[in-house]
Design a protein with these regions (language model features):
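A glycine-rich, aromatic-flanked flexible loop/lid motif
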Residues: 5-10, 94, 137-149
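Iron-sulfur cluster-binding cysteine motifs and their immediate structural context
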Residues: 91-112, 122-138
């Protein structure tokens, strides 16, 4: 990757170490290189209303803060739950594995708060009775983040994308919309 980039253009892509980390769910290095080639280099001569920053994080731990960039990508491992298999163990491995408390043992079985779940996937396969499996792996895309004097967390699109091509298309559309409709300094 090349360093540098100034002015109202796509900036160099930032990424965490991805799959070389124990929590990495996607190959951030390879994917950020693809994004870099297509948008940093490919859009190098395209003037935008303001700089445009892109970050790729391998998991929901948010180490490189993708949600605080104009566009951020975060690896996802969406769990599937079959709560009918839950036996209400008093030593629930799913509850122990969940770093944010989205899964808790209730009076008789596991309670899963889907709204709270960040799709880190640490609970997948932890239950010996097969309560939690993997529904899909993919990418969450955040748009509209900002870092600096005025910080704003980007909004996650309401869909977990399952291929890099889908994400690249979202980036292309976001950049095209920003180029055509964005305001200077926005």
């Amino acid at each position: 990757l090349e360093t540098g980039g100034t002015g109202p253009k796509v900036r160099p892509v930032v990424a965490c170490k991805g799959t070389t980390c124990q929590y990495g769910l996607i190959d951030t290095v390879a994917f950020s290189r693809t994004i870099h080639e297509r948008f940093y280099k490919g859009w190098h001569d395209v003037r935008l209303p303001h700089k445009f920053k892109i970050a790729v994080g391998g998991c929901p731990n948010n180490c490189v803060k993708p949600d605080l960039n104009d566009l951020g990508v975060i690896g996802q491992r969406v769990p599937s739950h079959d709560l009918s298999k839950c036996r209400g163990c008093k030593v629930c491995q799913i509850e122990k594995a969940c770093p944010i408390g989205a899964s808790r043992l209730g009076e008789s079985r596991l309670d899963w708060n889907e709204e709270m779940c960040n799709h880190c996937g640490r609970c997948v396969g932890k239950c010996p009775f097969g309560v939690v499996g993997e529904e899909k792996r993919g990418y969450a895309v955040y748009i509209g983040g900002r870092w600096g004097k005025r910080t704003a967390q980007g909004r996650m699109l309401a869909h977990v994308f399952t291929s890099e091509e889908e994400v690249l298309e979202v980036i292309e559309r976001a950049l095209t919309l920003f180029r055509d409709e964005g305001s200077a300094g926005e």
